[in-house]
């Protein structure tokens, strides 16, 4: 009679699904209203002119134009704006 003792179960083998965060459209690119520019957790980038912010801090275009990334203000915050083309 062939017997094999059962192996123990493992406690590994899990990982969370990636959230696909990051910059989706870059400076100089032409963008349309509603297009996503940045997906982020918190305000790594702030919304400038022509850019809206969703409840999960996603930045999206409100107008058509060209994307511009800039640092400004006392704390040199990074802003994303849209320059009308």
Curated annotation (Swiss-Prot):
Gene3D superfamilies: 2.40.50.100. The keyword Hydrolase does not apply. It holds the Pfam family Ribosomal_L27. GO terms for cellular component: cytosolic large ribosomal subunit. One of its GO terms (biological process) is translation. Residues 1-21 are annotated as: Disordered. InterPro entries: Ribosomal_bL27, Ribosomal_bL27_CS. Keywords: Ribonucleoprotein, Ribosomal protein. GO terms for molecular function: structural constituent of ribosome. Belongs to the bacterial ribosomal protein bL27 family. HAMAP family: Ribosomal_bL27 (MF_00539). This is Large ribosomal subunit protein bL27.
């Amino acid at each position: 009679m062939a017997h094999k003792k059962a192996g123990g179960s493992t406690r590994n083998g899990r990982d969370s699904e990636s959230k696909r965060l990051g910059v989706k459209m870059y400076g100089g690119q032409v963008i349309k209203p509603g297009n996503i520019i940045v997906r982020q957790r918190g305000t790594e980038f702030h919304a400038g002119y022509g850019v809206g912010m969703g409840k999960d801090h996603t930045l999206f275009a409100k107008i058509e134009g060209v994307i511009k990334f800039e640092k400004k203000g006392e704390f040199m915050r990074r802003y994303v704006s849209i320059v009308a083309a």
